[in-house]
Amino acid sequence: MDTQTNTAADSLAEILHALRVIRAPIQQGEYDLHDLVRASLAEAEIPCAHEVPLAPRCRIDLLCPGGIGIEIKRGQPDRKRIVMQLTRYAACGQISSLILVTERTVAVPNRIHGKPISCVCLNRLWGIAL
């Protein structure tokens, strides 16, 4: 594994660690979840840009260094729609990997366009699998 790949993997692991400590109160609005995620990243000293346009009509919720994109969904997202959305993001050159943060579990592929996809389910972090 080369240094650049190792650095990207390390960055992804750091971001996932920062997200997995979030304990979101039930009944948060989507932008409240954005704020919780941004606060957790800031506490871990991980910079991110909010609502970043990747292409026309294609804007990711958060973009971290190294092209790690974070999409945040409240409630139970529709699997087909979220996979289509992640596919659009993964097709963009600025994206190296994607993290989907949801309140409820949704099955997504491990890779799209060869880019790793991770999912962080906030309810699971409480020990609740919905």
Please provide the spans of the model-predicted regions:
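Conserved catalytic cores of phosphodiester-cleaving nucleases, focusing on short active-site segments
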Residues: L62-Q76, Y89
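Short glycine/proline-enriched coil/turn segments at helix->beta-strand junctions
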Residues: A42-I46, C64-I68, C92-S96, G114-P116
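Short, charged, amphipathic alpha-helix that recurs within catalytic cores of restriction-modification
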Residues: G75, K80-I112
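Short, well-structured alpha-helical interface segments that form or flank functional binding sites
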Residues: D32, R57, R81-M84
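Catalytic centers of nucleases
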Residues: P53-P65
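Structural signal for conserved beta-strand scaffold positions within catalytic alpha/beta enzyme cores
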Residues: H50, E71, L100, C119-C121
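Acidic-basic catalytic patches of nuclease active cores, encompassing PD-(D/E)XK
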Residues: D2-P53
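Domain-level recognition of nuclease-like catalytic cores that cleave nucleotide substrates
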Residues: D2, N6, L54-A55, E103-L130
